[in-house]
UniProtKB/Swiss-Prot annotation:
Protein residues bound to Zn(2+): C7, C10, C33, C37
Cellular component annotations (GO), alphabetically ordered: ribonucleoprotein complex; ribosome
Keyword Secreted part of the UniProt annotation: no
Gene name of the encoded protein: rpl24e
Function as written in the Swiss-Prot or TrEMBL entry: Binds to the 23S rRNA.
UniProt keyword Transmembrane present: no
Cofactor: Zn(2+)
Protein's name according to its UniProt entry: Large ribosomal subunit protein eL24
Zinc finger (C4-type): 7-37
Comment on bound cofactor: Binds 1 zinc ion per subunit.
Length: 61
């Protein structure tokens, strides 16, 4: 039975058969639910704690 994965950027669950697996040169495996999450992490180096649409969002105050 396929397992559900968790997005490395936003933290949402990824259903089996969807999403993208990205493998870095050091062997680290990153799972992304959308191109929005992939670009935010890899291209723009954004911090997921600063965006309300992620489950990792933390209010500063």
């Amino acid at each position: 039975m396929p397992t559900t994965r968790q997005c490395s950027f936003c933290g949402h669950e990824i259903p089996p058969g969807t999403g993208l697996m990205y493998v870095r040169n050091d062997g680290t495996i990153l799972w992304f639910c959308s191109s929005k999450c992939r670009k935010s992490m890899l291209k723009y180096h954004r911090d997921p704690k600063k965006y309300k649409w992620t489950t990792r969002y933390m209010k500063v105050r």
